Amino acid sequence: MAGIRLHVIAPLALAAVSKCARDPAVYVRRCAANALPKLHDLRLEEHASAIEELVGILLNDHSPGVVGAAAAAFTSICPNNFKLIGKNYKKLCQILPDVEEWGQILLIGTLLRYVVARHGLVRESLMLSIHGTNSNGFCEKDGLGRDLTLDKEDGGKSDSFDVNLVSLVSKCYIQGPDEYLSRSSCTDTVSSAFDTKETTSIAHNEDVKILLQCTSPLLWSNNSAVVLAAAGVQWIMAPLEDVKKIVKPLLFLLRSSSASKYVVLCNILVFAKAVPSLFAPHFENFFICSSDAYQVKAYKLEMLSLIATTSSIASILREFEDYIKDPDRRFAADTVAAIGLCAKRLMTIPTTCLDGLLALVRQESFAGDFESADGEAGVLVQAVMSIQTMIERDPLRHEKVLIQLFRSLDSIKVAAARATIIWMVGVYCSLGHIIPRMLTTITKYLAWSFKSEASETKLQILNTIAKVLISAEAGDFHMLKRIVVYVFELGEYDLSYDIRDRTRFLKKLLSCKLASHEPAEDSVASQENIAAHVVEHVFGRKLKSVSPITLHNRFYLPGSLSQIVLHAAPGYEPLPKPCSFVYEEQDQLSDLDKQREAAADLDGSEESSETGDENGSSDYDSESSNGSDFSSEGDERTVSNDANDPAAPLIQISETSVSADQEELRSRRALDLWLDDQPSTSNQTPSALNSNQSSYAKISIGDVGSRVKPKSYSLVDPGNGSGLKVDYAFLSEVSNVSPLHVCVEVLFENSSAEPILEVNLEDEESMKVADSSEQTLVGKANASYNNIPTLIPMEEISCLEPHQSTKRLIQVRFHHHLLPMRLTLHYNEKKVPVKLRPDLGYLVKPFSMSIEEFLATESRLPGMFEYSRRCTFDDHVKDSRTENGKDKFLSICESITLKVLSNSNLHLVSVDLPVANSLEDATGLRLRFSSKILSSEIPLLITITVEGKCTEVLNLTVKINCEETVFGLNLLNRIANFMVEPSSSAT
């Protein structure tokens, strides 16, 4: 409906999207987020604020799928409304690893823009390391050499970065599209000073720390675009010493598809131009593969020429020797050009490169006719141009090289190569002592071959003989003048009008020289003086070498399309101006906040007084923990309060008995409320409501907590532990360190005949800073929760005598509900690696609620949040044989409850039995348990329904309602499995 581009129905579509944005179903809310950009495209100015408020509501959603779609909507609707991001910043960073891959790209860009707009660039980052000093007077420019330069083999330092280029890149990242038009004219005057008020320090900025911490794991994402986006954040915002972490993930992307490889190389090239030492140690990763496309080969050659060092140039040149023999002669020509660039950068190899290039010129010049081999001609031209580039650095030193090139003119047939050599004749005609004496012979040869030359060569001959005539010595002046006059006569009657025009221009310009008899003769007339100055200005000055930055001065944000096409693509937005956004933290009671609180209530939040940052969680199992405010409902498994009253009757007829019809009625009432319609049930009488429902009896099973026996697991058996046996069992106690920890009781028993000394369990990685996606971020930026230890150290057992046993309590925090924790068992100066496997039943905590609250929460978790599984149960059959005369229904209820509470940490809400059942039929018996997931505080409801006879094996239907689908399904399988397992003992 939102895709119908009619303004007439736009208000209706907006109303529907507004309702769907608050729907209990995640898929519906996600569709609402996807519909917002379509509504925005209709240019509904009067509804612009309402659409932006909906974007804010969806950004505060607890589902990663919705947040990813909301980030896309934010990017297209209001990319500069950073107020919406500021209210949810920490939560968005926290949920970032769980968002779908394509949503992560947009969300990373949004968070980066927010941080730059609010806090500015980081003073310790590469972007600002060259701009003066920081507030403490430390010069980042000096520090960069220590952090990023690579050590040479001889102990020296290689060049670390290009100061001018880094300055230009940092400026380009924050300039708008209009400023790009004038950038080429002011490249040489780029300001390198940033206002210190527009910068921040990572040491005192929690927002920057969180962003870098959340994007670091994404450097190893399966999606290449996500890796590039995360690398862009680290490149722009990370401290100098941390920029290196982007290198290996980017190099890993070079193993992907050809298209991805091309995009990655485009971005790596920018990084390498700014800081060549980043990729210098990894030059082998840029060696050419036979399967690479030509564009990829060209970028790899450019990379190798950029990152070559004195220690790696030998290996790189050996590779280049093989590339020159490649059948693709265009690629071979590019290789020759790369050799010239390497020789220009490194002062130690020009001689070696010159010898090789001269040999290549001789080889190619005698290879045959180039008219049908354009590729071979390209190789020869590039070889000559590379030699020219190396000669420019020190022409006098390479006089012999020039002489060899001049002598090879007769054998070189390629027009472009001949034109380049002839150009060098004119430029270096007065160099040294040998070349001036060769000029007469060379110009005679050029005059003799003028008629058969190509147009570009003829033009260069005309320029060269003019330069030679200007710098001619007295002894050769008359001969050279006659040669010049002869060539000018040939040029005046050439078929090409370009040649004729150039000849007339030069003839008029050199008229003063052609009319004089001696080169040193002074012209008296003012006209001749002016002509002499013009000639000197045109032919006597050398051209300034053009900086490569001037030629390639367009830099765009890493990972963007604009960086590939080298112009601002449609939709490209540079980074905002640093510190251009001022966040008003006092504005906490806005209409948007009220709507978000209402949405949170509809989503079933049990703690409405907490802020929106504490409500977020993933729809599937996440490795990040949410919220810094935790609630504990008790330190042990709980059952209904009525069970603690000894005077309470065993069976009660429930006055608020619940039926399927009434549950459906409640669901309909909730739907009517959501649609802002008044339910029309006020006229119905209670008898009408209860006419079709069946009555249920509420069973009180007493206090079963004392009879619960947690299941024990083996950690180390005596055979592997040299007589040391270690078992562990999960406890229902609440950790006194953090609600994220689980209490585990460990039993150490010495089964050997010798004492065992210094027994301890340790986590070797607990003191290391984890830089992976398993590292969690806790809400409200509470620093005490950012580094929650994985294992609380236990008290060491100094000595364990033979056949002695002792218990220890450890507290662990599992990063994932399915992955085991790797620990190390120390004893007798030995180390044994062990795995402590999590029990899903103890990764939840009891959550006390009434039957009405249970049903209300259950009604809000239908569809994809509800899943069930059937299993069998026979523990009550064994109990009935030992407990004669006990009520059968009570025995079944106690057996099921004990089985559940012995394997999980839950709260028993109620036990209901249909009154109409016969004495032998347990069908319809229903037990309800409630809990919350430790890591996310999300409610998890369990309903067990019984079918079958009391004295036979029962069929159980276990149903779970939970928003975290993956966790709920895994726990469902766990419950179904342990319900089938036989009990160790019946009590």
Curated annotation (Swiss-Prot):
Cellular compartments per GO CC: cytoplasmic vesicle membrane; Golgi apparatus; membrane coat
Keyword Membrane: yes
Ranges of compositional bias, category Low complexity: 614-631
Keyword field: Cytoplasm, Cytoplasmic vesicle, Golgi apparatus, Membrane, Protein transport, Transport
SMART domains for this protein: AP3B1_C
Predominant location category: cytoplasm
Annotated membrane topology: Peripheral membrane protein
Alphabetized InterPro entries for the sequence: AP3B1/2_C (IPR056314), AP3B_C (IPR029390), AP_beta (IPR026739), ARM-like (IPR011989), ARM-type_fold (IPR016024), Clathrin/coatomer_adapt-like_N (IPR002553)
Compositional bias (Acidic residues): 603-613
UniProt-annotated location(s): Cytoplasm; Golgi apparatus; Cytoplasmic vesicle membrane
Domain of life: Eukaryota
SUPFAM superfamilies in alphabetical order: ARM repeat
Function: Part of the AP-3 complex, an adaptor-related complex which seems to be clathrin-associated. The complex is associated with the Golgi region as well as more peripheral structures. It facilitates the budding of vesicles from the Golgi membrane and may be directly involved in trafficking to the vacuole. It also function in maintaining the identity of lytic vacuoles and in regulating the transition between storage and lytic vacuoles.
Complex formation: Adaptor protein complex 3 (AP-3) is a heterotetramer composed of two large adaptins (delta-type subunit and beta-type subunit), a medium adaptin (mu-type subunit) and a small adaptin (sigma-type subunit).
PANTHER family: ADAPTOR COMPLEX SUBUNIT BETA FAMILY MEMBER
UniProt record similarity statement: Belongs to the adaptor complexes large subunit family.
Name this polypeptide is given: AP3-complex subunit beta-A
The species this protein was found in: Arabidopsis thaliana
